[in-house]
Amino acid sequence: MNLTFDLTGKLALVTGGGGVLCSGFSKTLAAAGAKVAVCDLRPDAAEKVAAEIRENGGCAAAFTMNVLEKSSVEAARQAIYETFGVSRIDLLLNGAGGNNPKGSTSRDVLTPEEAAELTANGTIEGVKTFFDLDPEGISFVFNLNFLGTLIPTQVFARDMCAEGGTIINVSSMNAFRPLTRIPAYSGAKAAVSNFTQWLAVHFAPVGIRVNAIAPGFFLTEQNRTLLTNPDGSLTPRSDKILSHTPMGRFGTPADLDGVLLWLADEKFSAFVDGVVVPVDGGFAAYSGV
C-alpha cells in the first residue's frame, strides 16, 4: 500500500497565494506534485511564490486576481486555463481573507467606568469601543472572507461538476470561539465555516468535496500589530494567547501541511466532506483551568 501523498497531474489554484499562510500552501501542494496557479491581488507577491516553486523544480504560474470582483476571477480563470492547457482545475483553495482595523475594538470588554464615560461624553478619547465600529469596515471584512470564498467557488466549481474535485476553504479558530476585539473577523470566519458545510452538502452528488482548515494563532500580516510590538516583542494579548495554548507557541505554516495534504489527496480523504479541521496547538481544548 502506497501511503505517500501524491498530487501528480493535479492542477491546484490558491487564492491569496502571496500571503504568509497561502504561500506555504502553494509550495506544499507543488512539493506533492501538483501544478499550482498562485493567485493574488498583488501580482509581485504571487510571482515571487511561483518563481520559488519553479526554482525548486515545481510547476507554478502567477495570476492577478481580485476575489471580490467576479470579472477579475473570470479573467484569471481564462488565463489559467490557457497557461496550463486545461478546461478545469482539480483543487480550489480559497485562502484570500483578512481583517481590517475598522472592524476591531481596542478593548476586550466594556467596563462600567467606560460605559459611564460614554453616557456622559458620547466617546472615550483614545479608545475604540463597540459603538465606534465602522459599518464599512465590518462590510469589508465580511466581503473579503465570505464573498472572497463564494465568488471563486462560483467561477471554478462550475467546471469541476462533470468530473468532481476538491475545495478547501480557510476558516479560523475564531469561528469556533469568537475572540475579543475582532468581532467582524470572528463573524466572517464563522460564515466561512457554515458555508463550507453548506457547499459540501450541495456539491456531494457531483463529486466535489468541500472542507476547511481552521488555523489557530499564526503570525501573519493581518494580526502582527495585535500580537507584536514595533520592536518585535510580544504584546500582552500574545502572552494571553500563549498561556491558553497548551503547546505554548504560535503555529508556523509547516504545521498546516499535514491537514492540507490529507484533505487535498482523495486517496486519504475520499469520504471526508463538510468538516472544519482545527490546527491550534490545543487552544480550543483548554478551558484555562
Listing of model-derived features with the role each one plays in the protein:
Residues L3-A37:
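Canonical Rossmann dinucleotide-binding motif of NAD(H)/NADP(H)-dependent dehydrogenases/reductases
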Residues V109-L150, I168, V192, M247:
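Catalytic Tyr-X3-Lys loop
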Residues T153, A188:
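Active-site helix of classical SDR
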Residues R158, V201-A204:
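Alpha-helical segment proximal to the catalytic Tyr-Lys
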Residues G164, A204, R209, F268-D273:
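Short, small/polar-rich loop/turn modules that mediate ligand/substrate recognition or access, typified
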Residues S172:
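Residue(s) in the substrate-gating loop at a strand-loop-helix junction
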Residues P178-S186, W198, L226:
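Active-site loop-to-helix junction immediately N-terminal to the catalytic Tyr of the SDR YXXXK motif
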Residues R249-V279, A284:
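C-terminal substrate-recognition "lid" of short-chain dehydrogenase/reductases
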